[in-house]
Amino acid sequence: AASVHYPIRGAVTFKGSVGVNVASDALANLASSGVTGGALIIVGEDYGEGSSIMQERTHPFAMKSQFWLLDPRPNLPSIVKAVKDGFELSEASNTPVMLMVRIRSCHVTGSFQTRDNQRPVLSVKEALSNPRSDFARVVLPPMSFVHEQDKVKNRWPAAERFIREKGLNEVFGPAGSFGIVVQGGMYNGLIRALQRLGLADISGRSEVPIYVLNVTYPLLAGEFLAFCEGKDHVLVVEEGQPEFIETQLGSFLYRAESGVKLHGKGIFPLAGEYTGQVMLDGVTGFLKVAAPEM
């Protein structure tokens, strides 16, 4: 709550769609009014093997309230970096950010380089001694109408600019006539499948072009279309249903009048966890279409 009026960072953790649903009223109001300090909602995406709740995704909640959604590659340096990026993205766009951590991401081991602690610009004690209020932040008409326009005219473009300039999404591999777009959290599974096919090594060096979406919402049309240049086929690896990312990327291609053939659900199953075998079967099926000579 302090992040709304003050340059104070705040974070909270929820378990998947259950915790987000319980807090949905407060979260929707937070997303409407916007924030001054960085606000980060860390969500344990409880989907697939090991889950203890209904099989739903966080993605549609982020879309309906315009929370920017981070889905970092499952290694400790990437996850730690995503926390820093999430706070900075929130502050740059005055919008709360969701950081999604999948079940398997929570079981990785490794190491990461730490940073020195930094004193906050404003402490909670200092904020309490000089309380602020802004009636325009109240989520009631007519202010709520202004909030909606601010989202699409100011906050969204600011978020896209930050994501693009900071390079939050990543591209790996050489140029080629086909490529793969993958949610950041599914990157390890994809690399393992390519490794089993002899198209990647254990360090992640890939012979296939890969566009990694460490930010799955919002998607950047220009960045995606640049990745598609010179390609005939592109595969979207999107776990869970419905296929929000695939649909949006298809819209980008349609509006650009691109001839790139987009693959996704159909080659991959519509629902369920993308286990090692499912990932291998899906990538193999795509390569039979996009690169039969391989």
Where on the chain are the PLM-derived regions?
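Thiamine diphosphate
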Residues: 1-91, 102
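Flexible, low-complexity linker and terminal segments
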Residues: 73-294
